Amino acid sequence: MTDTNVLANSATDNQETTHFGFETVRKDEKVHKVAQVFHSVAAKYDIMNDLMSGGIHRLWKRFTIDCSGARPGQRILDLGGGTGDLTAKFSRIVGEKGHVILADINNSMLNVGRDKLRDSGVVGNVHYVQANAEELPFPDNYFDCITISFCLRNVTDKDKALRSMFRVLKPGGRLLVLEFSKPILEPLSKLYDTYSFHILPKMGQLIANDADSYRYLAESIRMHPDQETLKGMMEEAGFEQTTYYNLTGGIVALHRGYKF
C-alpha cells in the first residue's frame, strides 16, 4: 500500500469516527449510544437536574429566556428541549398567536416532556416534533428564535447542526446555546472535576440506578468545545454578533448569535 493510500484511508477513518465521552466510536454508533443514555435517564431527568445543580439550572434557563428576546406572536424552536422547561416559559411569552415547537431526537425524552407540559396545562400553542438537530425538518427562515439547552454536546456533527439551525432561522433571528463549558477559575475546575467524576456517577446510581449514563455526562462535558471554540463554530456557520456569558464561573456558558 502506498503512502497516499494510507493517508486516504486515515482520512476516511477520521471522518467516520467521533467521541462518545472519552471513547472513540463510529459516528452512527454514537447516535445509538446517546439514544440509550437518554432512554435510560428520561424518567428521572428532572429530579437529577435539580440534585446535580442544586436547582441552579433553573436560574441558567431563566437567564436564557431573558436573553432570547422572545415576544408575543413569535415562533420559537426549543431544540433538544427534553422535558420542556424552556418550552413552558416560551409558551406563556408568545401567547395564543405565537407558536413553540419542542423538538428532540429522543422519543423517551419527548414523551416525558409532552406529558409534563400537558399535565401542567401548557397546551394550544405548543407542538412536539421528533427531529435530528443536524437535519431539521422545517422550512427556511421560519423561526424567530432557537434555543438548544444542554443538548449540543450530545450531537454527533455539531457544525452540521449549527448550519441547520442557521437555515431555519429568520433574518434577525437569534440562536441561544446553553451548555456546560469550561470553568474559568483553576480551583473551581479541580473541584468540579472531583464532583463530576466521583460524586455524579454515584448520584446517578442511587437515584436513577444508572451510573454509566452519568459518567458519560461528565465525559461529554469535558469533550465539548470551550467557550471561544464554540463561538468560532457559530461564526463559521454564519452567525453574527456572537457573544457568550459565563455562568457560575464558566461551569455553564450561554452563547448567543444572530442571523442577518
Curated annotation (Swiss-Prot):
Classification via PANTHER family: 2-METHOXY-6-POLYPRENYL-1,4-BENZOQUINOL METHYLASE, MITOCHONDRIAL (PTHR43591:SF24), METHYLTRANSFERASE (PTHR43591)
Catalyzed reaction equations: a 2-demethylmenaquinol + S-adenosyl-L-methionine = a menaquinol + S-adenosyl-L-homocysteine + H(+); a 2-methoxy-6-(all-trans-polyprenyl)benzene-1,4-diol + S-adenosyl-L-methionine = a 5-methoxy-2-methyl-3-(all-trans-polyprenyl)benzene-1,4-diol + S-adenosyl-L-homocysteine + H(+)
Q: What is this protein called?
A: Ubiquinone/menaquinone biosynthesis C-methyltransferase UbiE
Family annotation (CDD domains): AdoMet_MTases
Keyword list, A-Z: Menaquinone biosynthesis, Methyltransferase, S-adenosyl-L-methionine, Transferase, Ubiquinone biosynthesis
Task: Tell me the Pfam families matching this sequence.
Answer: Ubie_methyltran
- UniProt cross-references to SUPFAM superfamilies, sorted A to Z: S-adenosyl-L-methionine-dependent methyltransferases
Ranges in a coiled coil: none
Q: Tell me, which GO biological process terms does this entry list?
A: aerobic respiration; menaquinone biosynthetic process; methylation; ubiquinone biosynthetic process
UniProt lists the family membership as follows:
Belongs to the class I-like SAM-binding methyltransferase superfamily. MenG/UbiE family.
HAMAP family named in the record: MenG_UbiE_methyltr
Highest taxon, organism lineage = Bacteria
Q: What is the lineage of its organism?
A: Bacteria, Pseudomonadati, Pseudomonadota, Gammaproteobacteria, Vibrionales
Q: Does the keyword Transferase apply?
A: yes
Among InterPro entries, the record links this protein to: SAM-dependent_MTases_sf, UbiE/COQ5_MeTrFase, UbiE/COQ5_MeTrFase_CS
Q: In which pathway does it act?
A: Quinol/quinone metabolism; menaquinone biosynthesis; menaquinol from 1,4-dihydroxy-2-naphthoate: step 2/2; Cofactor biosynthesis; ubiquinone biosynthesis
Give an example GO molecular function.
2-methoxy-6-polyprenyl-1,4-benzoquinol methyltransferase activity
